[in-house]
A protein has these predicted regions:
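N-terminal presequences and immediately downstream first alpha-helices
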Residues: 1-21
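A generic structural signal for short
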Residues: 16, 40, 98-99
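Alpha-helical context
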Residues: 8, 12-15, 31, 61, ...
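Conserved beta-strand hairpin/beta-sheet module of binuclear metal-dependent hydrolase folds
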Residues: 26-92
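Active-site HxH/HxHxD metal-binding segment of metal-dependent hydrolases
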Residues: 76, 86-166
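Residue-identity detector for glutamine
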Residues: 22-25, 83, 161-164
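A short, structure-level motif marking secondary-structure boundaries and short turns
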Residues: 12-13, 67, 94-96
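Short amphipathic alpha-helical surface micro-motifs
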Residues: 19-22, 34-37, 104
Length: 166
């Protein structure tokens, strides 16, 4: 064993220290700092939740909550949001929605929430457009204009064939 490996073995392994004993249950919020709440939404996969954040906010003088990310569009997430609105928002509406990126667990409920509260969605143009492209994908045969586009973008013949075969 080298001296470096022996020294590494003697080091104490770091541990995680959690500031809260339990995470919030879906449909509830836990205040982590003044004006900031931590929420969790369920996910139907191995990673069974996404952390979502609420920040006290005001738009045009009306108090509300800005949220960061929305959860995946599932019946369970919809039920959790409804429970939050009934119990944990102090009667305040959502004022704006920030989506960090276009993965379905981060942006999946954005449409429903923006319509329900008539608030704006904030995300980068690139993430928004990528999301729109992916939701427009019907799973049908690759369109000719898509093949031309990707060919002009420099995709190899193998990559284009993979795109066609999807």
């Amino acid at each position: 064993m080298t001296e470096t490996a022996a020294a590494r073995d003697r080091l104490e392994k770091p541990t995680l220290n959690y500031p809260f004993e339990q995470p919030p249950q879906p449909g509830s919020a836990l205040e982590v700092a003044p004006g900031v709440v931590w929420m969790r939404m369920p996910l139907p996969m191995m990673l069974n939740h996404i952390n979502i954040w609420g920040i006290e906010d005001a738009v045009d003088g009306e108090a509300g909550w800005a949220i960061v990310d929305t959860g995946m569009r599932t019946d369970e997430t919809l039920a959790a949001w409804r429970q939050l609105f009934a119990n944990a928002t102090d009667g305040k509406k959502l004022s704006r929605i920030f989506c960090t990126h276009m993965h379905p667990d981060h942006v999946g409920m954005a449409g429903w929430l923006t319509k329900k509260f008539k608030c704006r969605l904030w995300m980068t143009r690139l993430e928004y457009l990528n999301c729109r492209v992916l939701t427009a994908d019907t799973g049908r045969e690759a369109p000719d204009d898509g093949i031309v586009f990707y060919h002009r973008a420099g995709w190899s013949d193998a990559a284009i064939e993979n795109y066609r075969a999807r």
